[in-house]
Curated annotation (Swiss-Prot):
Biased composition, class Basic residues, residue ranges: 10-44
Protein name from the UniProt record: Large ribosomal subunit protein bL35
Swiss-Prot/TrEMBL GO biological process terms: translation
HAMAP family tied to this protein: Ribosomal_bL35 (MF_00514)
Single Gene Ontology MF annotation: structural constituent of ribosome
Organism, scientific name: Xylella fastidiosa (strain Temecula1 / ATCC 700964)
GO CC annotations on file: cytosolic large ribosomal subunit
UniProt feature, compositional bias: Basic and acidic residues: 50-65
Keyword Membrane recorded: no
Region of interest called Disordered, as start-end residue ranges on this chain: 1-65
Length: 65
C-alpha cells in the first residue's frame, strides 16, 4: 500500500499541539496595517485554534504531522 501524501499547503500553515489539536496564525496581518487598530493587530498576533469540525479534515490532509 502506498504512503499517503501530505498536503504541503496545509503543512506550512498548521501546527499540531501536544494535545492533538491544531493551531494556525491569523490572516490580515501582512500589509495595509495603518488603517487597522493597534488592538486588532495585537489580537491577530495570537494563534488561532482550529475547530473540532475542521480538525478531521486536517487529520486527512496531514497524516504524519
Amino acid at each position: 500500500m502506498p504512503k499517503i501524501k501530505t498536503n504541503r499547503a496545509a503543512a506550512k500553515r498548521f501546527r499540531k499541539t501536544a494535545s492533538g489539536k491544531y493551531k494556525a496564525g491569523h490572516a490580515n496581518r501582512s500589509h495595509i496595517l495603518t488603517k487597522k487598530a493597534t488592538k486588532r493587530k495585537r489580537n491577530l498576533r495570537q494563534q488561532n485554534h482550529v475547530r473540532a469540525e475542521d480538525a478531521g479534515r486536517l487529520d486527512r490532509m496531514l497524516p504524519y504531522l
